Amino acid sequence: MGVLHTISESPCALAELCDRTGLPRATAYRLAAALEVHRLLARDDEGRWCLGPAVTELASRVNDPLLAASAAVLPTLRETTDESVQLYRREGTSRVCVAALEPSSGLRDTVPVGARLPMTAGSGAKVLLAHSDAATQKVVLPGAQFTDRTLAEVRRRGWAQSVAEREPGVASVSAPVRDSRGVVIAAISVSGPIDRMGRRPGARWAADLLAAAEAITRRL
């Protein structure tokens, strides 16, 4: 946090960051580089660190009802499945991870909060695209690893699954989260290694995903 606060005052390069924080050069670089990976820091035209886009994104969610509602549900889902859980929102033709929790041990499918993923692969993408407008579907589907028939099946069944679509060796299952009017506003997901999730992850976890999605809706 000290590095973030320092750079929020004015952009700076490594030498100045060390002077202003009192941190050793290696430590300052390691911390700043890690923050840059998570988009909390970025580089300006002069190569100096400055605040990154994730800071604004996080600030906009401080009073976000969806995140407040999901905070009471995601931990239970993680304990039930012992896998990684995420919450995604659609932004244009991408999806953004707005909340994520990891299991305490074992291999994980880590998706950082703020990560922007394509809508062309993965169960979360299928759920969000299945409930998107026709114009968005028309743009995304030509490059997707699924078809409009897949989306119709997602709407009929109420959930989606994927195996090695977004990333080799990873399987996932997702369900839509609706607001009080019934409009889909997010996708809740469970993901993990295929060796644990299996090649039909929906058969194992879809019911729990649907219950978690409904629990979030009730809290909105």
What does each model-identified segment do?
Residues M1-D64, R218-R219:
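N-terminal helix-turn-helix
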Residues S8, L129-D133, L210-T217:
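Short amphipathic alpha-helical signal-transduction/dimerization elements
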Residues L40, C97, S174:
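Short hydrophobic/aromatic beta-strand element in the GNAT-like acyltransferase core
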Residues C50-V139:
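Amphipathic alpha-helical effector-binding/dimerization core
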Residues V85, A175, I188:
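Conserved GNAT-family N-acetyltransferase fold
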Residues G143-A152, R156-A160, P168, A186-L220:
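Juxtadomain coupling helices with adjacent low-complexity linkers
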Residues P168-P176:
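A short beta-strand signature within small-molecule sensing/ligand-binding domains used
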Residues R178-V184:
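Flexible loop/coil segments at beta-strand boundaries within sensory signal-transduction domains
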